[in-house]
């Protein structure tokens, strides 16, 4: 998966999590110098396929609106995914959270410490 050089907070990117296609992730926090990024994941991949792991609804908070037609259902993990730049692939253009869901996204972002969480090597 191609690595992206300029990652922006508030945009969707494809996250490589071991699956063949990856999953859309919304960046809520970043530290370019430390190469650390925190993302909120959605349930389906770019093609709209729901991952098997996401069928387990524990520890998930549903959003009220899908991000776009191809995404069947979106959610916010209570502990968003922390990753390095190499784990972030192609930017997904045209994906946006519904305005009514922004409060949930901001709530997740506010739970992140100012210096960001620790990242295992």
Give the predicted meaning of each segment.
Residues 12, 24-27, 50, 91, ...:
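Compositionally biased, intrinsically disordered low-complexity regions
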Residues 4-17:
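Short coil-to-beta transition motif at edge beta-strands of beta-rich domains
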Residues 16-17, 21-64:
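Compact nucleic-acid interaction/catalytic patches
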């Amino acid at each position: 998966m191609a690595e992206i050089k300029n990652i922006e907070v508030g945009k969707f990117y494809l996250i490589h999590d071991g699956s063949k296609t990856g999953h859309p992730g919304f960046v809520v926090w970043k530290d370019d110098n430390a190469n650390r990024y925190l993302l909120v994941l959605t349930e389906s991949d770019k093609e709209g396929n729901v991952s098997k792991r996401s069928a387990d609804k524990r520890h998930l908070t549903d959003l009220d609106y899908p991000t776009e037609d191809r995404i069947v259902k979106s959610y916010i993990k209570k502990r968003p995914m922390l990753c390095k730049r190499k784990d972030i692939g192609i930017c997904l253009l045209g994906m946006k959270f519904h305005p009514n869901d922004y409060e949930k996204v901001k709530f997740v972002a506010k739970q992140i410490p100012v210096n960001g969480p620790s990242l295992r090597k």
